[in-house]
Amino acid sequence: MKLPQAFYARDTRTVARALLGKVLVHLDGGVRRAARIVETEAYHGPDDRASHARAGPTPRAAIMFGPPGRAYVYLIYGTSHCMNVVTGPEGFPSAVLIRAAEPIEGCLHSTRGPGNLCRALAIRREHDNGRDLWGEELFIEDAPAPREAVVTGPRVNVGYAGPWAARPWRFALRGSAWVSRPAPAGARAARAPAPAPRPRRPRGSGP
């Protein structure tokens, strides 16, 4: 069952935790590509200095000010896409970055790290930015609550955000081999299968 809009219309930190264990699905030309979410980051409100919303509703970040349950997909360094979910009440800019997932089916690439995840599921800004997440092509399916414990830590590569850099708004499933590096303390207890060679994960990928 697809998650309804009401799921996303909550505090972004609540949604970031609740998304762990859910299944991100992209129907790419009729091919189902799916992965279980194991790591997220919350970007909360206009005062969050790590968020794109800190500069107001710019052409790139305007979608964060819109209704919840929309995909916010942007390009970094001209090469990698990042998939976010708009959350909270409309007008309060917030989003959850999906940092990593465990591959389930149809994945084209490693799913560890936000750029890799979008590459694996063929999610692209030009096709998917602004989509609602209860449609027919890009959506998140409900799943049982994860058995793994949730660990938290600071978000990745947001040192420029001053005191906001230390907020423990990164969430991951303990023991998942697919959590991106550096993992939150205690998050990694296994090694993922060796992926095919891939570009280095871009830095500073949050919305």
From Swiss-Prot:
One of its GO terms (molecular function) is alkylbase DNA N-glycosylase activity. Residues 198-207 have a biased composition (Basic residues). Pfam families: Pur_DNA_glyco. InterPro entries: Formyl_transferase-like_C_sf (IPR011034), MPG (IPR003180), MPG_sf (IPR036995). Keywords: DNA damage, DNA repair, Hydrolase. CDD domains: AAG. Its EC number is 3.2.2.-. The keyword Transport does not apply. Belongs to the DNA glycosylase MPG family. This is Putative 3-methyladenine DNA glycosylase.
